[in-house]
Amino acid sequence: MSLQNDIIKELGVKPTIVPKEEIRRSLDFLKAYLLKHPFLKTLVLGISGGQDSTLAGRLAQLAVEELRQETGDQSYRFIAIRLPYGVQADEADAQKALAFIRPDQTLTINIKAAVDGQVEALKAAGIEITDFNKGNIKARQRMISQYAVAGQTSGAVIGTDHAAENITGFFTKFGDGGADILPLFRLNKRQGKALLREMGADASLYEKVPTADLEENKPGLADEVALGVTYNDIDDYLEGKEISKEAQEKIESWWYKGLHKRHLPITIFDDFWK
């Protein structure tokens, strides 16, 4: 029996959206969170140059601009952080994203020394890290840096998780999967594109082939190749449409595998994993 309806309900995906309304919904969500927590004045997000961080970043910037205007409190701001490992091959894309976002402040924190130091420390302890595992260390180090900045600036860390990513568990546990607030949650991949189009983004910012690009042995590996299923199929599934049995089984397999990522650390009272 297909899990489709249950998953759609859990992730809150609509079969169709009005982009302008969803932009407003995300902006109001971000603003309400900051207003509810008066000790928070900053939104922090790592910008990779991909669709998701570009969209979340622009939403964050617009949200703090509105708060400054509406409250008169000029201390609200958005900090965008570039977090390359060494030299990023598609740095030009990241710069184009920043030009669209127009953040109040941009920081660059190169994570290479921290990641390599961790790998070497593990090696000295007799633990040889695989390329895949090193990729997860990169993702977690990026979040360490974002939380360090947030901690020094009275900030909250934005996550870029959305429905098409959540359903497949295509994120690093306590890496990019760790954040304070998720303004894109409920949207699938094509709906995120629609929001960027509505916001006037250049097509190159949302038509770029999605890639986590964490593995050095597989540079630029496309998400769809890693997942074995297309975002078109994932989006159709999340919108309640019929897809091939093979694609459906693949998506639901990823859903089961990623259950542990969608929960806080397991307690004795949890039974979802049994």
From Swiss-Prot:
Q: Name one GO biological process term.
A: NAD biosynthetic process
Highest taxon listed in the record's lineage: Bacteria
Binding positions (deamido-NAD(+)) = R140, K173, D180, H260, K261
Top class in the EC scheme: ligase
What InterPro entries does UniProt report for this protein, alphabetically? NAD/GMP_synthase (IPR022310), NAD_synthase (IPR003694), NH(3)-dep_NAD(+)_synth (IPR022926), Rossmann-like_a/b/a_fold (IPR014729)
Q: Where does ATP bind?
A: G46, I47, S48, G49, G50, Q51, D52, S53, T160, K189, T211
Give a yes or no for keyword DNA damage in this entry.
no
Q: Which reaction does it catalyse?
A: deamido-NAD(+) + NH4(+) + ATP = AMP + diphosphate + NAD(+) + H(+)
Keywords of the record: ATP-binding, Ligase, Magnesium, Metal-binding, NAD, Nucleotide-binding
Q: What is its EC number?
A: 6.3.1.5
Q: Which GO terms describe its molecular function?
A: ATP binding; glutaminase activity; metal ion binding; NAD+ synthase (glutamine-hydrolyzing) activity; NAD+ synthase activity
Q: Provide the Gene Ontology terms for cellular component.
A: cytoplasm
Positions contributing to Mg(2+) binding? D52, E165
Pathway, per record: Cofactor biosynthesis; NAD(+) biosynthesis; NAD(+) from deamido-NAD(+) (ammonia route): step 1/1
> What's the subunit arrangement here?
Homodimer.
What family classification does the UniProt entry report for this protein?
Belongs to the NAD synthetase family.
What NCBIfam families would the database entry show? nadE, PRK00768.1
Tell me, in a sentence or two, what this protein's role is.
Catalyzes the ATP-dependent amidation of deamido-NAD to form NAD. Uses ammonia as a nitrogen source.
Q: Which HAMAP family match?
A: NadE_ammonia_dep
Protein name, entry field: NH(3)-dependent NAD(+) synthetase
Q: Source species, please? A: Streptococcus uberis (strain ATCC BAA-854 / 0140J)
Phylogenetic classification of the source organism? Bacteria, Bacillati, Bacillota, Bacilli, Lactobacillales
- Gene name as annotated: nadE
